Amino acid sequence: MKKILLKMTALCLTVVLIFSGCANFDWGSFTQPWEPELVAFQDMEYTRPDPDALERKQQAVIDGIEAGDDAKTLMDKVFSFYEDYHTYYTGYALANIHYFRDLTDIYWEKEYDYCTENSARVDAALDQMLYALADCPIKEELEAEEYFGEGFFDSFEGDSIWDETFTALAEQEAVLEGKYYELSAQAAEMDVYSEAFYNGCGKEMAQLYVDLIKVRQQMAAQAGYDDYLTFAYEVTYYRDYTPQQTMEYLGDIQKQLVPLYKKADLNKYWNANKTCTEEQVFHYVRDRAQAMGGTVADAFTLLETAGLYDITYSDKKYDASFEIYISNYYEPFVFVNPTGRATDQLTFTHEFGHFCNDYASYGSQVGIDVAEFFSQGLEYLSLCYGEKNTDLSVMKMMDCLFLYVEQSAYASFEHQAHKLEGEELTVERLCALYEQVGKDYGLDIWDWDGRSFVLVPHFFTSPMYIISYVVSNDAALQLYQLEVENPGEGLKKYQDNLATMEGGFLAFVTSAELSSPFTEGRVETVRKTLEEVLK
C-alpha cells in the first residue's frame, strides 16, 4: 500500500499513453498491448527484482534533464525506468502470492521480505524522478497530450517527501510489517484466543503495533503533516474526504445502526452459513459471472483459463483473502483461504470484483474506496443473478449490517489509536481503547477482549484502509437497490464504470450518479432499508 498515489500515477501514465494514439513515439515494450498475450499463472516466471538497476535508470533521467535532452530522448529514458518499475512490482506480486500460499516456505519468505524491504527505495525513485521532471525546463513539452498530458505535474511541485530520512522510515515500517507476517505464521499453530497466545505472539504483536504507530507518526511529521491521519488520507490513499468527515460519519452509524445490530437475530446468519465446498464456491461465482455477461463474464473466462486464482484451504496459507495485479503480465490474481462455509462464496465474489476492475482497466488506478465499490458491488449483484439463493441473500444483508457496525468500530479504533502520543501510546492504553470501542459499537455481545486488536491484519499492514470498506459498502448497496427496483440497472451501472479513471471516491459517486455516504440522513435511510429486509 506504500504511496498509493505513486502507483496510481505509474498506471495512469501507462493507460494515458495506450489510448493517446501517438504516432511519433516508438513505445516499444513500454506500453500496454491492446490484447495482452494470455499467460497461465503456472507459467509466470519470477526473477528477483533489481532496485539498483532501477535507480540507475532514474539517475539517467535526472542526467538527461541536466544535459538538456529533448522531449523524445527524455521520454525514452522515462519509459525505460517505468519498465523496471513495473518489473519490480511484478516480482513483488509473484513473491507475495507464493509466500502467502505457504508461510513455511523459506525461499519465498526471503523473496517476499526482500521485495517488501526495498519497496520504499523503488517508490522513492519514482517520486523523485517525477519531481525532477516537474521542475525541468521542458515541463510544458512533457505535458503535451501525446506525453504526460496537461496539468500532470501539478501534484509534483515543490519538494518530494521521499528524502533520505523519509525513505529510511518507510523501510523501517516495511520491516515491522514483515515481522507481523512472521508472527502471524507462528500464531497459525496456536489457539489465538488462548492466554498462551496473548502472553506469547499476541504480546509481541501488541508492542509491534505501538512501534508501527510511532514510525508512522514520524513519517507524517517528516512529510510536513501535523498528524498521521491526514497524511494517510492525502498521501497514501489520495482521498477526497477528511478524517473529520469520517469520524462524524462513524458517529451517525453508531447512533443509527448499533441499536439494530444489538437486536439482530444472529441465528438467521449462523443457520444460513452452511458448509460449502471449494467446487460450490467456484461454481457460484462462475455461474453468476456468465449470467451477468459482458466484461464480468470475460474476466471470469480469463481467471479460469489462466488459473489466476487460489481458493483451496491450507493451514499453511496466510489466513486472509486479496486480489493483486501482476503488472508485466497484465493479469490479476485472486487469493482466498476459505472457511468451508457459505460465506466463501461471497468472499470469492468480492475478490473477483476487484479482478473485474483490474481486468477492465489494465490495472486499476482508482483510489482504494472506489476499488472496494467494485468488489462489494459484485457481492450484492451476485444475489440477483443465477440460481436464487435465499440463505445467501439473508447472510449478505446481515453481513451488510455487520460490516457497517464492525468495520466502523475498527476504523474508529485505529483513528483514535494513531492520535495517541508519548506516554499515552502504550499496549495497555491500546487494549483499553479497543475494549471501550467494542462497547461503544455493541461488539460486546460477543466474547470481546481488548487484546484481540492484534488479530486484525489491516491495523498492521494497511493502516487507515478499513474505512474504505464502510463508505464503499454504502455506494455498493445502492447498486443492489437499483437492481431490485429495476432489474438490469444496477448491473449496467457496474459494468459501465468498471474501467473508470476517477480516483477520488466522492468524485466517483458523483460521476456515477450515486449518493454520497456523507449526505445528511443517508445512514438513517440505510437503517430503514435494513430494518425492512431483516424483519
Language model features by range: what are they?
Residues 250, 256, 361, 366-403, ...:
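Post-HExxH zinc-binding segment in Zn-dependent metallohydrolases
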Residues 13, 17-21:
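Hydrophobic core
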